Each structure stands twice: as C-alpha cells, then as structure tokens.
Regions:
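C-terminal regulatory or interaction extensions
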Residues: 1-70
C-alpha cells in the first residue's frame, strides 16, 4: 500500500498529483515538478514510485512517459 512504502511528504505530493489528475487526463515529470516545485528528477522518482504501488499507470517511453490514474 501507499502508506507502507512512502514518507508522509511523498504521500502528500502524490495527493497533489492525484488532484491535478481529476482535471487533466495525464501528467508528466516536467509538469509534476512544476506543480510540486521540485526538481524534475525528484518528480520522476515520485511518479515511478506511485506507479510501483499501483496508484498511477504510465504509458510511453522514458522521454515521453505520461502517467494517469489507474
């Protein structure tokens, strides 16, 4: 589950992303970084973590990867 494998900060950030995804279909790491005011690599790590715990799903190759709600 999300709470076991993530810090409170990560969970809070994922909530922001999920909120964004209620309005938009997809998000990428650049947009997530902007939204969370973090570096792009931090955002990508967070997105892939969210995918690992099955909160998000992704499509596309690394460079153009987008994430959406499961």
């Amino acid at each position: 589950s999300m709470s076991e494998s993530m810090s409170e900060l990560e969970i809070a950030r994922i909530q922001v992303i999920l909120q964004y995804l209620t309005v938009h279909d997809t998000i990428n790491s650049a947009k997530a970084a902007e939204l969370l005011d973090v570096e792009k690599k931090t955002a990508s790590r967070l997105l892939s973590k969210a995918e690992k715990v099955e909160v998000l799903i992704s499509k596309g190759k690394t460079k153009d990867k987008v994430y959406m709600k499961k």
